[in-house]
């Protein structure tokens, strides 16, 4: 009855730090309810030898679709985290993920409790099914939202910001497709109109590492890890019990909001707080064209910073903190109780991943988006998280 967790260095996508922590927590279930084993891409076919095998994919876009199809051919149930099966009707897999309308309800309840009713949806990628479903779910729930309140990313983030800027005073809350867009917006608005951010709500999505470490921490829509673990355990148990009769299950994670500085730490409303009236089914007009965030010079730079942070272990995050604080190499090594050779090893790895040749360039690379105070708090909070 093992749960096989795909863990392969050949995965095409760097898993976020949060996802890697979740995988560690899932493996810890081995001591309680679910025996778990890591498995590589080359070993997928061997799972057929276990009549009770279930494969867990930590991220849909990290693996080829052929892996899911191969498991389907061999009657091996597949669970995918954070990707609804309805997004890929040609594939059969179970999912444990959030739901766009649940997220929309939580966001609108939060904004309404704070008296923020004039909403804008910013930097929603026209070619992203996730962005489109999230934006439409908000439009379905919000009373006053109109198609012109959607500022979709068509050609570049800067162009989207330029379209938004003349209308900025019309809104008291801006909801973003992800934390990267929220961070880019804060940076651009601080340069263009520093007083604008005070009193307004800016809410991202996905709870990235940068949302906690940026100079202005970003409130984000997310979920609780305990709900994810409960969801995986429930789906796994059901697939084993009804193996052969169940093709796929969809477990919906309850929405949660991580409240941070971009909403001035405004407290969450009571669960019983009423929602705004339904907006019916306002159809948002996404432009035909679109671009990928990775290709945008602004969003791509922020995503690259996130990737670099996710690739760092705890020692390297501590080294980064000391460097951002202006400490010398000698002081850094002494403070972390590591040798000069160990410090050199880690810094070379960090420089190579960041594509820089020296310490000062490395510091400039991260100082733009990482607050030493917030990194200190993160390291303290996650002292036992294995990061």
Stretch-by-stretch model annotation:
Residues 1, 85, 91-121, 157-162, ...:
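Hydrophobic alpha-helical segments within soluble ligand-binding/sensing domains
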Residues 1-109:
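Alpha-helical recognition/docking segments in bacterial nutrient-uptake
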Residues 356-372:
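Short, basic, alpha-helical segments at the C-terminal edge of helix-turn-helix-like DNA-binding modules
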Residues 316-323, 350:
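Short alpha-helical "packing" element that flanks the helix-turn-helix/winged-helix DNA-binding module
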Residues 25, 40-79, 107, 111, ...:
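Hydrophobic alpha-helical
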Residues 273, 293-315:
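Regulatory hinge/linker segments at domain boundaries
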Residues 326-361:
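Recognition helix of helix-turn-helix DNA-binding domains
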Residues 18-20, 24-29, 90-93, 169-170, ...:
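Flexible loop/turn connectors
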């Amino acid at each position: 009855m093992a749960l096989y967790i795909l863990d392969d260095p050949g995965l095409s996508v760097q898993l976020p730090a949060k996802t890697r922590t979740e995988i560690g927590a899932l493996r810890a279930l081995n001591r309680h309810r679910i025996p778990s084993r890591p498995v590589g891409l080359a070993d997928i076919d061997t799972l057929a030898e276990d009549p009770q095998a279930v494969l867990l994919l930590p991220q849909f876009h990290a693996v080829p679709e052929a892996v899911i199809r191969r498991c389907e051919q061999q009657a091996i149930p597949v669970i995918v985290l954070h990707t609804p099966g309805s997004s890929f009707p040609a594939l059969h897999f179970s999912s444990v993920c959030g739901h766009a309308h649940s997220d929309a309800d939580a966001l609108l309840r939060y904004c309404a409790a704070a008296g923020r009713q004039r909403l804008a949806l910013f930097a929603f990628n026209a070619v992203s099914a996730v962005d489109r479903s999230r934006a439409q779910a908000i439009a379905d729930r919000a009373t006053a939202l109109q198609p012109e309140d959607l500022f979709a990313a068509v050609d570049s983030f800067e162009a989207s910001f330029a379209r938004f800027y003349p209308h900025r005073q019309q809104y008291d809350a801006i909801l973003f497709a992800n934390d990267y867009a929220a961070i880019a917006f804060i940076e651009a608005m601080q340069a263009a109109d520093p007083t604008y951010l005070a009193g307004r709500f800016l809410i991202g999505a996905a709870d990235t590492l940068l949302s906690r470490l940026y100079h202005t921490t970003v409130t984000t829509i997310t979920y609780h890890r305990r709900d994810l673990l409960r969801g995986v355990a429930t789906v796994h148990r059901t697939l084993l019990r009804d193996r052969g009769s169940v093709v796929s299950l969809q477990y919906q994670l309850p929405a949660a909001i991580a409240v941070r500085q971009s909403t001035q730490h405004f407290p969450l409303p009571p669960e019983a707080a009423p929602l705004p009236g339904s907006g019916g089914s306002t159809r948002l007009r996404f432009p035909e064209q679109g671009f990928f965030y990775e290709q945008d010079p602004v969003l791509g730079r922020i995503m690259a910073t996130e990737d670099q942070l996710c690739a760092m272990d705890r020692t390297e995050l501590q080294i980064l903190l000391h460097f951002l604080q202006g400490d010398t190499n000698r002081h850094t090594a002494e403070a972390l109780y590591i040798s000069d050779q160990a410090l050199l090893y880690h810094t070379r790895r960090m420089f190579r991943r960041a594509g820089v040749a020296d310490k000062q360039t490395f510091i400039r690379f991260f100082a733009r988006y990482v607050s030493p105070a917030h990194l200190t708090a993160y390291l303290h909070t996650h002292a036992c998280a294995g990061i």
